[in-house]
Amino acid sequence: MIAFLSGRVVSRGAETAVIDVGGVGMTVHCTPAALARLRVGEEATVATALVVREDSLTLFGFADDDERDTFERLQTASGVGPRLALAMLSVHTPDALRRAIATEDTAALTRVPGIGKKGAQRIVLELKGKLGEPGGDTAATPEQSAAAAPRNWRAQVVSGLVNLGWSTREAEAAADAVAAEAGEQPDVAALLRSALRRLSRA
């Protein structure tokens, strides 16, 4: 497993970053929290997970080990692959996901595009006790989450849409279209749903 990458950030997009590691440009599919920490031209270290498929090798990047570990544990539930796990971390922090599983809050899980009521119930059933207890030291506080939301909502919406199969260009256009709905404290899940409705009508 490639546990982390360290190098200069060459570029940063809506859901990916390219990091120069010893002269090799590594494309990393990142959570919004990971992307928010990267600055083009600066050195960075990103926690990573390598997903191997018959026809591809894909690196996923995270803000810290907690995000990466949560990403990997989410995939132990049936029907949850890398893209859906990344979408879950685009909407919720790891601690919010732990809390949702521990309290059987299926409504919180259905805020993630691609998860319906039955899927949320299955995820709760299969992951109960596997994500750890909520309230860990690495979790963002409600105040931190609220402060981050105005800055990061667009990246989260774009990342969520791309993870659901839309192109980066389509996702960015949809995010721009719902920007007027954001307000001072954006509801990322509501903005994602609104963007999805616009894309479905297009």
UniProtKB/Swiss-Prot annotation:
GO cellular component entries:
cytoplasm; Holliday junction helicase complex; Holliday junction resolvase complex
| SMART domains noted in UniProt | HhH1
* Matching InterPro entries: DNA_helicase_Holl-junc_RuvA_I (IPR013849), Hlx-hairpin-Hlx_DNA-bd_motif (IPR003583), NA-bd_OB-fold (IPR012340), RuvA (IPR000085), RuvA_2-like (IPR010994), RuvA_C (IPR011114), RuvA_C_sf (IPR036267)
The UniProt annotation puts the region (Domain II) at 64-142
Q: What does this protein do?
A: The RuvA-RuvB-RuvC complex processes Holliday junction (HJ) DNA during genetic recombination and DNA repair, while the RuvA-RuvB complex plays an important role in the rescue of blocked DNA replication forks via replication fork reversal (RFR). RuvA specifically binds to HJ cruciform DNA, conferring on it an open structure. The RuvB hexamer acts as an ATP-dependent pump, pulling dsDNA into and through the RuvAB complex. HJ branch migration allows RuvC to scan DNA until it finds its consensus sequence, where it cleaves and resolves the cruciform DNA.
Comment, domains: Has three domains with a flexible linker between the domains II and III and assumes an 'L' shape. Domain III is highly mobile and contacts RuvB.
Q: What is the protein name stated in its UniProt record?
A: Holliday junction branch migration complex subunit RuvA
Q: Which organism is this entry from? A: Thermobifida fusca (strain YX)
Source taxonomy: Bacteria, Bacillati, Actinomycetota, Actinomycetes, Streptosporangiales
Name of encoding gene: ruvA
